Structure formats: structure tokens, C-alpha cells
Amino acid sequence: HTFVDLKSPFTLSNYLSFSSSKRRQPPSLFTVRASDSDFEAAVVAGKVPEAPPVPPTPASPAGTPVVPSLPIQRRPRRNRRSPALRSAFQETTLSPANFVYPLFIHEGEEDTPIGAMPGCYRLGWRHGLLEEVAKARDVGVNSVVLFPKIPDALKTPTGDEAYNEDGLVPRSIRLLKDKYPDLIIYTDVALDPYSSDGHDGIVREDGVIMNDETVHQLCKQAVAQARAGADVVSPSDMMDGRVGAMRVALDAEGFQHVSIMSYTAKYASSFYGPFREALDSNPRFGDKKTYQMNPANYREALTEMREDESEGADILLVKPGLPYLDIIRLLRDNSPLPIAAYQVSGEYSMIKAGGALKMIDEEKVMMESLLCLRRAGADIILTYFALQAARTLCGEKR
């Protein structure tokens, strides 16, 4: 209705009468618009264009008391009253780029379901692994971390298979890099998948976990992974001094570009059970409390943080995630380095179980838990929900 037929003499009155008419005629091929000054003159003359009326005040339910407005200056709810405002003022965001996808691999061809972790599998390294990575990349997840299920026959007290350059992890890294050169591959550096004792280090006759001898083995493992093409090696063993020794070993072999993500604050948690089932890596005796941190301790995380920083760590990780939000925030507030959080198998399985029993909304709880880890200060999150959450973020539920 802002067009005037050039066959008729153009006047403002003609225009206004045309605008208010109910006729539905298509405009002629050649049309002109009234000028801004014409519109302004019409408004000044009192010919105000029609617009929707002022909306009525919404009715309150019957029985609502009539009270004076509270004498308060700030009403935080004003900034929450619409989706657009809530989105504009959102302080924390979540993106598929924030996720590192943990993948279990094994020597077989079949993808084997993990009973305690619904939706997770031990992937065949030749095919299942490539297919799962392709799915993740399709929704923006381009970082993975590999965890191997090692045959019992290859496990030894000193975990020598950990640095076999033709072993399962180095082979898988080479395969992935050949197919997806830009994929970021994190690796786990620890002896427990390779140890006949199921511990992260070499076990002495009296049950003591040997620190320095274990670090020697871990350095060889990290170098083997770097040589295969790993982008980030991630010592999860909690041995003292391993980050510095690993940095020296990597640099000596020409891998100055390979990063170290240290499991800085890895707690001796009960949330790891499903993971150990997935890898068949439960300790054959005892527990891991002499090297993993006491869940009761807070300040100790600062000690570990300072050591890892001074030894050359590039990323600091907290494990588990959601029960240790205070530790994530502690590291975030005291270190300039990137912070990672590991949403571990127990956290994942609890959400899955609650969802399956219809006790919670699985998708909403999943997304809230990940957002909370980000809000606490995590730059990246290792999560078994990586693919599912990324699909949700992309609006693609499959």
C-alpha cells in the first residue's frame, strides 16, 4: 500500500485515501513512493497512520490481592522476561567446540556395548572408530581422546605394551590422522590399561606404587603416542614429577609442538566404576588412594596446579567434573592456563539411568550439567555426551 499508480495524478490526499482503502490491487510496473516529508506533513496535520492498539493489561487470577508496588530500584527479573533478553545476557555459552569425545577402542571388528554405560561401545579400531569420529565431526566435535581395551595376554607388571609403537593406540592414531588430518587427538598416558595389576604405575612386592620408575615408562609411552601423531598427551596417572619429565622426553625427540594436558586434580573417586568396567582395568588389589587425591581436600589442588604449571603443562584437568565444580573454579581463578573438566563415566551413567527411568528429563539434565561445568570455568569438557549434546546444540535429534 505504499505504492501509487503513475496513471493517476499523484497527490498526498490520493495517496492517503489509497492507503486506507480495502482494495487489493497489485501495483503497476512503474511506481513511486511518497516522500518522507509528505509522510511527516500528514502526521503533523493529524492524519496519523493506523497501528495496532495498546495491548490491554493482562488480567490477574481471581482472588489476587491488590497491593502497592514494592519500593525497589532493581528488579533482576526484568532482564529475564523474554527468551531474547535471556539470550542477550547469557554469561556462559556451550558449543560443540568445547567438547572432547572419549572413545573406547579394542582389537576386534565389532562394536561391543558397555553394559554400565548405555549408548557407549568398545569400538573396533578399523571401522567403528572411524565411523564414530565421522558422526562427531558432522556436528562440530573435532577432538577425541582414546582409551584402549588391551588383551589380558599383553598386560605385564611393568606395562611395556604402553609404548609399543605398533600397539592399539599408536595404530589407531595413525589411522585417524590418515583419514582426518585436522582431527585433534588426545591420548591417555597411564599404565593401568596395560598393567597386570590394574594400577596406574609399577607395583612393588609390598604393594607400593613406584613413582620414578613409573614415570620412566610413562615418558616412553608419551613419546610413542606423539610419534604416531597425537596432538595432546594426557598423563592421568598422578605420579609426582611426571609432567616435567614428559616435557623433557618429548622435546628431546623433537615433539616440542605436542601439548600436555595434565590430570592436575584427579580425585580417588567412586564415580569411575563404569569406566573401569569398559577397559577391564580395575585394580587387582587395594585402591588408588596413595596417588590419586583425597575427595575431602581442596587446597591440595593448588599444590598440584603449581607443580604442573612449573613443569610445563599446557592444560590443567579436573576429574571428576560435576561433584568438583569448586575445584574447577579454584584452578580457573588461580591459573592462566586452559582448564579442562572430565565428566566421568559415573556422572554419565547416572543421568542415563535417571532418564531411562523417567525420573529426570535426560536431555535437559545433560545440557544443564555441561553448562554448569563451563560456568565453573572449564574451557573444554571431556564427556561421553559429546555427540548427543552436539546434536542437541545443532538442533538435530537423531
UniProtKB/Swiss-Prot annotation:
Binding-site list for 5-aminolevulinate 2: S345, Y384
Biochemical pathway: Porphyrin-containing compound metabolism; protoporphyrin-IX biosynthesis; coproporphyrinogen-III from 5-aminolevulinate: step 1/4
Biological process (GO), any one: chlorophyll biosynthetic process
Reaction equation(s) it catalyzes: 2 5-aminolevulinate = porphobilinogen + 2 H2O + H(+)
EC number: 4.2.1.24
Keywords in alphabetical order: Allosteric enzyme, Chlorophyll biosynthesis, Chloroplast, Heme biosynthesis, Lyase, Magnesium, Metal-binding, Plastid, Porphyrin biosynthesis, Transit peptide
Biased composition (Basic residues): 74-83
UniProt subcellular location: Plastid, Chloroplast
Binding site for Mg(2+): E304
Pfam family, one: ALAD
Amino-acid positions noted as binding 5-aminolevulinate 1 in the UniProt annotation, renumbered to this chain: R276, K288
Cross-referenced PROSITE patterns: D_ALA_DEHYDRATASE
The record's free-text note on cofactor binding: Binds 2 magnesium ions per monomer. The first magnesium ion is required for catalysis. The second functions as allosteric activator.
Catalytic residues (positions): K266 (schiff-base intermediate with substrate), K319 (schiff-base intermediate with substrate)
Region of interest (Disordered), ranges: 48-87
Chief site of localization: plastid
GO cellular component: chloroplast; cytosol
Molecular function terms from GO: porphobilinogen synthase activity; zinc ion binding
Matches recorded under SMART domains: ALAD
Quaternary state and interactors: Homooctamer; formed by oligomerization of dimers. Probably also forms lower oligomers.
Function according to Swiss-Prot or TrEMBL: Catalyzes an early step in the biosynthesis of tetrapyrroles. Binds two molecules of 5-aminolevulinate per subunit, each at a distinct site, and catalyzes their condensation to form porphobilinogen.
Record-given protein name: Delta-aminolevulinic acid dehydratase, chloroplastic
Organism of derivation: Pisum sativum
Gene this chain is encoded by: HEMB
